[in-house]
Regions:
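RNase H-like, Mg2+-dependent phosphodiesterase core
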Residues: 1-235
Length: 235
């Protein structure tokens, strides 16, 4: 895995575009992630290809930013979006996440690597010259992580990108995959692993350590969170 963001920006380009600018008349790829603020579970990045015609279908389905939709509705919408739109998913499980984070020690670079891989994978399925992602960190992070196909694309990074239906659809697919994987981890441990990073999450972490030992924590949780010190009583 080449997670290093070492290449300079060359022929491809990035654009910082106001959130109010509409790109709905264009074929485009939306990219979004889920799980970066959740102690338990994976980091998931989704990329979704949308045309103006597909956008109309998504609007009829009332697709919008996953943060504004209940988990139940997300799990209902995701299969329909998967059937309707070409897409790709990159899921980094907790154990692999911890290995990568230990090497690069920078969440934004890890996010950029995931965004780039999801975009590159989708470009194997579709022809598209425009992608939209939420703004995080240095704009060049995603661009530097792209390989040959991705270098040909115009990447728009902006705040509140989820207002674009392509990004909203990606946010739903990413969140649905996160929820399903978190549920599977909970079943494996016979312990409910809550979302987020709350006192309930800390309690669940302590239960995992008590039942299975400290090493098991690294297979279900993102260890660089300050929650880990609280779970292990190191604060």
């Amino acid at each position: 895995l080449d997670y290093r963001a070492a290449r300079p920006v060359a022929a491809w380009e990035f654009h910082r575009v106001p959130a109010s600018t509409s790109l709905s008349s264009l074929n485009r790829i939306g990219i979004d992630e889920s799980g970066k603020g959740d102690y338990f579970g994976p980091l998931v990045i989704a990329a979704v290809f949308v045309t103006p015609a597909l956008e109309q279908d998504l609007a009829l389905m009332q697709v919008r930013d996953s943060k504004k939709i209940s988990d139940g509705r997300i799990l209902e919408l995701a299969p329909d979006i998967r059937l309707l739109c070409p897409h790709s998913l990159v899921a980094i499980g907790p154990q692999r996440y911890n290995e990568l984070y230990a090497k690069i020690k920078n969440l934004n670079r890890l996010l950029a690597w995931g965004h780039a891989r999801a975009l590159e994978n989708l470009l194997q399925q579709v022809e598209c010259d425009l992608a939209i992602a939420d703004q995080f960190g240095d704009e060049r992070l995603i661009l530097n992580a792209l390989q040959e196909k991705g270098k040909q694309i115009r990447l728009v990074q902006r705040t509140k990108a989820e207002s674009d239906l392509a990004v909203a659809a990606a946010s739903i697919l990413a969140r649905a995959e996160f929820l399903q994987r978190l549920d599977r981890l909970s079943q494996e441990l016979n312990t409910t692993l809550p979302k987020g990073a709350s006192p309930a999450v800390e309690l669940a972490g302590r239960m995992v350590v008590k039942k299975y030992g400290r090493d098991r924590l690294g297979t279900v949780a993102k260890l660089h969170f300050k929650t880990t010190k609280q779970v292990l009583g190191e604060t």
